[in-house]
């Protein structure tokens, strides 16, 4: 807003979303934590989640677009990098389509979470009323 922009675009990609899935899985999570990184979160948009890191690098190289990587990405000091550099490559040897498969899995988990959220919202609209500052919950049968 300070510079006249309504949103900020971040270059997270499909591999980042997969890493987030595994980080949340390792920490212990519910369904929402297995939905990876979301395309929109408030004023943050992530327009590259459809593409893998490799696809983005290939595109940048083919079109002469400079690419920089944070040197901390090579350190296994961080859980994300341990997953990126250790676990994911092993899973890719087991299934070369791992990135696409995980993208589809994350998409299905996201759809399930959205469905649950809609169901809860419907139940809340039907069962919860507020009048004169008093909240009433009517059990449904």
Stretch-by-stretch model annotation:
Residues 113-141:
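Acidic catalytic cores of enzymes that act on phosphate-bearing nucleotides/polynucleotides
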